[in-house]
Amino acid sequence: MPAPHRLYPRSLICLAQALLAWALLAWAPAQASQELTLVGKAAVPDVEVALDGDDWRWLARKRVLTLGVYAPDIPPFDVTYGERYEGLTADYMAIIAHNLGMQAKVLRYPTREQALSALESGQIDLIGTVNGTDGRQQSLRLSVPYAADHPVIVMPIGARHVPASNLAGQRLAVDINYLPKETLARAYPQATLHYFPSSEQALAAVAYGQADVFIGDALTTSHLVSQSYFNDVRVVAPAHIATGGESFGVRADNTRLLRVVNAVLEAIPPSEHRSLIYRWGLGSSISLDFAHPAYSAREQQWMADHPVVKVAVLNLFAPFTLFRTDEQFGGISAAVLQLLQLRTGLDFEIIGVDTVEELIAKLRSGEADMAGALFVNSARESFLSFSRPYVRNGMVIVTRQDPDAPVDADHLDGRTVALVRNSAAIPLLQRRYPQAKVVTADNPSEAMLMVANGQADAVVQTQISASYYVNRYFAGKLRIASALDLPPAEIALATTRGQTELMSILNKALYSISNDELASIISRWRGSDGDPRTWYAYRNEIYLLIGLGLLSALLFLSWIVYLRRQIRQRKRAERALNDQLEFMRVLIDGTPNPIYVRDKEGRMLLCNDAYLDTFGVTADAVLGKTIPEANVVGDPALAREMHEFLLTRVAAEREPRFEDRDVTLHGRTRHVYQWTIPYGDSLGELKGIIGGWIDITERAELLRKLHDAKESADAANRAKTTFLATMSHEIRTPMNAIIGMLELALLRPTDQEPDRQSIQVAYDSARSLLELIGDILDIAKIEAGKFDLAPVRTALRVLPEGAIRVFDGLARQKGIELVLKTDIVGVDDVLIDPLRMKQVLSNLVGNAIKFTTEGQVVLAVTARPDGDAAHVQFSVSDTGCGISEADQRQLFKPFSQVGGSAEAGPAPGTGLGLSISRRLVELMGGTLVMRSAPGVGTTVSVDLRLTMVEKSVQAAPPAAATAATPSKPQVSLRVLVVDDHKPNLMLLRQQLDYLGQRVIAADSGEAALALWREHAFDVVITDCNMPGISGYELARRIRAAEAAPGYGRTRCILFGFTASAQMDEAQRCRAAGMDDCLFKPIGVDALRQRLNEAVARAALPTPPSPQAAAPATDDATPTAFSAESILALTQNDEALIRQLLEEVIRTNRADVDQLQKLHQQADWPKVSDMAHRLAGGARVVDAKAMIDTVLALEKKAQGQAGPSPEIDGLVRTLAAQSAALETQLRAWLEQRPHQDQP
């Protein structure tokens, strides 16, 4: 008992191993398979399947029928598209599954062997597309065939005739999965077998000359030939190998499945089999029925004695017989002969002739056994025998496409009709249309050409032939006019009367060809693209050949002369070539800079001595090598980088490269200018690269030093600018007190005239010193590139008039006549910076008066429109002492002066005016030119091109009234003044007192903040730079307090007050929360103007002063608008004034409300548009402050992408200005007298 106990585990292990091995064998093919979707015929027929009850019950239990297929496809049996499986086998599988009530499943395996293994292991139920020659058929049982399998022999078109019985010495191409090697070796022992993975590859090998003969089944061959190789190969004969047909294969032990499959296949009617064959286009490509007709013993003996039959055909009888340009015989008759070859086993040797007479002569002489295509003619039946006709076709009339050409047979009377000589239609046509004149031609092509050339009016030909020629060679020239009422022409084979056996064989074979096959052949050749050799088609080539022959003869004669000259010139050319080569060698080697030539792979072809000297190598070390191979740079990584640069960036892009590079060679870094140029041959193909470099290390070092020097000079210039600005601040602070006190002393009435004169002198001197500081700052700004112009709409006439008014008194004091000449045509308003233009004109006029002792100074202005712009010239001429050319060259340099006349002595001034003036004009895009000569005088011309602006529809501003004292503001404000400089604090307080303001002063930021918290102020004016709390900090604290919740006072106006002339000072003030910035020194009039502008913008609810509260008159001008503009615009029409102003008030109020809504929505483009609209209303009443605000808002909103505090402030300011404008307009209207409308 112990022994079985010990053996039990070992037996169990063995059993487990066996089961595992079986499972792995079963699993392996399943893993290699791919499940496909079966796509069968759309309409699957129902057939009567005779099965017993057991079979139906077995099928009901099985439910799924699995078909195995394998790669590669065998079209048309197996065709795979992605995961779809279709084809002839798929159609039959669909019929089987449908009629058995089964679900069909398809598994595809990579090879045939794997599919057969899957069948043996039970993974699949059956396999398709197998025949009786399969080498493994002992393990298979085959169903009844569902498709015929006739092996056929295929050869290239035009191949020499080889007996199909043995194929001796031929290379035989076969699909490895089609026929076993033993079967082919027995059938063709003298042939060399070549196996290919698929039938398509085997057939391609024959088509492209890699093999001589292909053997495959007729269905697959027909499909492949018709799809891809119709013009390359042809079926020449059947291969006498029995295959048994294409069947389904099942395991040998699965007899029940075999029985039910056979039951379905046998129940399929023949019509359905034909339908499936035709569904895959296999009914007409080649004959699929190779069953030979029943030949008699004498006929079989005749075929054995005459294996080759000579067939005479017309060279050009398209589309029945023709020879292509590749010398291959084709046409309808050729296809019919191919079918006959398959059914008889005879080989046909084609003999081409040009005419029917030659063809008949060949038959009578015995040189030909039969005619391939001939019209059946009763006259010829006396010596010829005709076969059954294989083409019957009606006769048609072909004419030119002319209006007078015959349109039908009734119009042939009196016309010339061309026919082929000895045509059967000639006697019929002459009997039917005796008035027609008949001319003959050798062949149909010549007859067509006679009509096309006008030698005949019409040609009578079969419809097939006529259509072929007209569509192919005479399109647009000839046309088929109509059918001819003659019996249809019949095309048949013909032999001499004694060839009875041959004619019987031909007739039996023809009768075995179905009408469908014949119709398919005719249909194919109706639209064939065969290229027959016709005189018409090739006459140009023939003419060309004749011309080439004559040209060749001429060239031959010329060649003799050429050779004699060539011999004489050769030595001269050799000497010239040697000279050129020597010149190129000297040119390249004599160049001091390295030059090299490389091929497209980067190998060195040529280099000069400078290249070799740079790296210290010989030519042998670099020629024929790439940069990494030669490694002359000493660094392998750098060598690879340079090699990649040449190949990828120059050779690949094919663009010249010029660049500076830093290269380290043998431990030394050199800066080189490198150039590389790709070059090619005459065809544009890249051949290599020409390159070189120039060592620019020293030049690069000089440039670096130059850059450092420039940076040092720029730093010194910036230090100078900062010094000048700082200096101006230090000078302006005490100057502010001096000028302000002097101005107040001059304004206050006094009886002490001598004191006033002294004060006037001191005031003028201080103003001159201030102008000096301004000039210094202007030149510093210009040199720093931070000088900005502010062009605005300006009336061009105002600019020279203002300069004349300023200098008129000075000119009268010196006894000089100051003249203004204007020649302004078509120009009104222009865009210009009026302040800077006045500065230029003032400098030029002032200099002219300064250096003129007698005579006159003329300011001339000329302006003409030039498109959208205006060409403007200002010219200042004097009769002074004049300036030499040497002095003129110095005048426009900063701080340069030249002496005046000998009597006048040295010229006063700083020497900055002319320099600044020229630079200002250049910034405006113009030129300033001086012309002068000693003793003659000087003329300075300024030429500008200015943008013109449409003239504003408003009245001109009234002339400024000349007053002894400036007017005071119309409101009394509570003002807090802050400055740590006592004189400036006292001055500003007295200026504000003079203007009628209520002033409280503080000498520090801390004191000012305390006073602001205790009292309500309308305006705060603070110095910017103070110890402790600066003006900027004071502004920030005030604005923070105003923004705090619960702040009940009105927001105050905050001015910065500074002597700094830095260009960004105003921005710094606004950034700190100030409304604006005042610059020291400031006069009383300027201070009044700034206060009035601030009051207008802020619309302070301060009660008016006694002066402002007085009843207004028509001459009074309100702060927010111009009454003069309104009166001029309305011609003082009271009704129109009220109507206009009411509309302005209403429109402005609605536009401001809409603007605020758009501002809340952050719709910046529409905000900009609304601001532009508000500007129009403001211009009507000349509301200058409001115009400035809306223009700034319009510009700022353009292109804005997000929130902007600056836009927020502009919108608030604009709303306040609009409210103030409305209040003042209504108050002005109330003061005006009411008039009844007429």
From Swiss-Prot:
E.C. designation(s): 2.7.13.3
Keyword Oxidoreductase annotated: no
Positions of the HPt domain: 1133-1228
Record-annotated PAC domain positions: 652-708
Major subcellular location class: membrane
Residue numbers of 4-aspartylphosphate PTMs: D1023
GO cellular component: plasma membrane
Modification note: Activation requires a sequential transfer of a phosphate group from a His in the primary transmitter domain, to an Asp in the receiver domain and to a His in the secondary transmitter domain.
Periplasmic-side segments: 332-541
Effect listed in the UniProt record for changing H729Q: Loss of autophosphorylation
Keywords: ATP-binding, Cell inner membrane, Cell membrane, Kinase, Membrane, Nucleotide-binding, Phosphoprotein, Signal, Transferase, Transmembrane, Transmembrane helix, Two-component regulatory system, Virulence
InterPro entries: BvgS-like_periplasmic1, BvgS-like_periplasmic2, CheY-like_superfamily, HATPase_C_sf, His_kinase_dom, HisK_dim/P_dom, HisK_dim/P_sf, HPT_dom_sf
Subcellular location: Cell inner membrane
Variant or mutagenesis effect after changing H1172Q: Loss of activity
Modified positions (Phosphohistidine) in chain numbering: H729, H1172
Signal peptide start-end: 1-32
EC top class, as a word: transferase
Protein name per UniProt: Virulence sensor protein BvgS
Native source species: Bordetella pertussis (strain Tohama I / ATCC BAA-589 / NCTC 13251)
Gene this protein is translated from: bvgS
